[in-house]
């Protein structure tokens, strides 16, 4: 078992939220993925993160700490990471996610791990530099966002139960609203709202 399994199974563990994003089933222990679901932590497949940031963005929006394993970035002519993978996020996708990480409202710590520092490929070093540039751009943009926000409210009725969604009028981002305390609202996507209208409520909203 790896370090993550040990953290999640320790009695002293006090993680309120944890998201494992971009996993590939054949590269992860089945027991770990099963454990993540048992403790109601979120897992998102690599396939769900490709081509668009919409499904993964809500997990970054209020993240306090984000760690990036460079194994999640695809390698081609020369290894980008110390454990290179042929499948992974491409260059444009990883830069888009770095910007989303920087846009987090609560980001305090960010770490990049397993970058192949011994790579002789100039493109690999350019990519890691651009990734950090997009991270900083996201942070700078977040600092310009207004402190006071207004929201549009959307109510969905399922089996006589009302579920409220909020849309930030400035950013266009969506939240599942639990009461009036904005800190308890759950970041979500427009797709979550559309699915709820069809009677498919994301189970993480009920935890």
PLM regions and their residue ranges:
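Conserved alpha-helical scaffold segments that buttress catalytic/binding sites
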Residues: 1-112, 116-207
């Amino acid at each position: 078992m790896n370090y993550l399994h040990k953290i999640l199974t320790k009695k002293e563990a006090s993680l309120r939220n944890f998201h494992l994003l971009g996993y590939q089933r054949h590269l992860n222990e089945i027991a770990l993925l099963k454990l993540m679901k048992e403790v109601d932590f979120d897992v998102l497949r690599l396939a769900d993160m490709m081509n668009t940031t919409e499904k993964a963005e809500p997990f970054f929006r209020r993240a306090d700490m984000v760690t990036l394993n460079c194994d999640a970035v695809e390698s081609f002519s020369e290894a980008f990471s110390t454990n290179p993978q042929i499948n992974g996020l491409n260059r444009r996708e990883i830069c888009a996610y770095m910007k989303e990480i920087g846009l987090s409202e609560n980001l305090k710590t960010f770490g990049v791990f397993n970058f192949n520092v011994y790579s002789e490929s100039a493109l690999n070093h350019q990519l890691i530099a651009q990734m950090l540039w997009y991270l900083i751009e996201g942070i700078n943009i977040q600092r310009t966002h207004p402190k006071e926000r207004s929201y549009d409210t959307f109510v969905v009725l399922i089996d006589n139960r009302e579920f409220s969604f909020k849309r930030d009028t400035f950013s266009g981002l969506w939240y599942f609203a639990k009461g009036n305390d904005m800190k308890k609202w759950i970041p979500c996507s427009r797709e979550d709202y559309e699915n709820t209208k069809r009677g498919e409520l994301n189970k993480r909203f009920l935890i």
